[in-house]
Every structure is written in C-alpha cells, then in structure tokens.
Amino acid sequence: PRLETIIMEATYGGKDDNPPARRESEEELIKIIKETIEKKGKVLIPVLGVGRAQEIMLIVEKFVRNKQLPEIPVYVQGMVWDVTAIHTAYPDFFHSNVKKAIFNKDQNPFMNSVFKHVGSQKEMQEVIEGGPCVVLATSGMMTGGASVEYFKALSDSDRNAVVLVSYQGPGSLGRRLENGDKDIRISETETIKVKLNVFKLSGFSGHSSRDQLMEFVKMLEPRPKKIILIHGESSKCLELASAIHKQFRIETIAPRTLDTIRIR
C-alpha cells in the first residue's frame, strides 16, 4: 500500500486540548441541572440541531429513567423537535442499547413524557415565565435562533444557568460567555449584563482530542509524506502541525483559506 498525503482535522489541535471523559461530562451536566433546579432556576443548553441535541436528550432521559434526576420538564425548541422526529422514524440506525429499548421494551427515549415541544413565541414566553426546567434550543454557538432569545430572558438571574456542550467559534456569543464576559453587546442598542451561571462541558465533542490525533498519526503505516491540517482555528492547526513534524518528521501544512497546495 502507498500513502502519500493525509488531510486531517485540528479542531482540538492545541497542546492542552484533551477533553474529559464522556462519563465525567454526563455526570457534571446532571449535577448542574440538579443544583439549578433546586434553586428554582432554569438550565439553557444551546445545542446543534442534528446530533448533539439528541445526545443530550438521551442522557437526560437515562438519568430520569434511573431516578437519578427528578422528572422536570425539558423543553425542546422547534427545529430540534422536528429533527428528533426524523431520528425517531429510523430506529434501525440507533446505537444498539437504544434499539433494544425500543424494540424489546417498547421504550423510545425520545418520546419520554419529560420532553415538551415549544413551537411558538407564545409557548416560549410561557417557558420563560414558568417554573424550573431545562431548555434545549439552537443555535449551539448562540449566533442566532431561540437559544439567544432564551439567554436574553434568563441572563439577569444567578439562579439560572447556561451549559455550553458544543464547540464555540471565535466571535460567537457562546465564545464570549465561555471567556467570562459579563457585559454582552447584542446589538447597537442592547447590552446584556450576565448574571446567570455559565458552564462549559467539553466531553460531548464529536471531534478527536489532541492525544487521539497524535496517536492516529503514530499508527499510520506506511507513514505519509505530507499531512495537511484543516478544520481548526489557525493557532490549533499550526500547533498540531508543529507537534507532528517535531515528533514524526513528516512534512506538515496548515493552509490558510484559499491557499493552493500541490499534492504531488
């Protein structure tokens, strides 16, 4: 076999980019939800509509079913609900544990009674004015959509919490919250003072950690002549490119947008 060039991601290419184990993040999420609910607050979880939202729903449902989390309402905003309905229509593609629950026990986790659909502005306002709950809404980086509207409504109370479970891109509202900003400018005329609690959980990422990326390169046989790093912030691509070159003596490239590269 011949291996000439590898194109690989560098989302978590920084030297300290090794997220905690998935189980740790699951337990931390449930802990945050419990503590916030006990304070009579609300938990906003901005999610990616496809994939991440359904993962969080499965986690919450599991802990509710096992009596490790009280049966508080989990409000699922518009698009997330629609995408989840498509997931539910194709159970054959689920993880084996979920398939067994559906086919052997007639328990579809996505149809648990804790999940409530929010489909209108009026219903959203009722959620905001109502009691303790969890809210799943897009967009995951809080660049727009219902997650921003919920944030604006919930940000003025330290009883509430926002839990960031996705990557937050530079310049996004989510990244500013992640960085600890307490005065968030939403528009020319609107600035939000952040009083709610902000949590970042990295263990839900669908991307490989720095160690996993380095291990992948180590296992390549034969060694490629060239590795091109993409899908990451410029600093992450450069850091990973440098580390790979230093450890494996492979030519690495961290191209900028619109750069042209000759493969051979």
Model features per residue range: what roles?
Residues 1-264:
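Acidic/His-rich, metal-assisted hydrolase cores and their charged scaffolds
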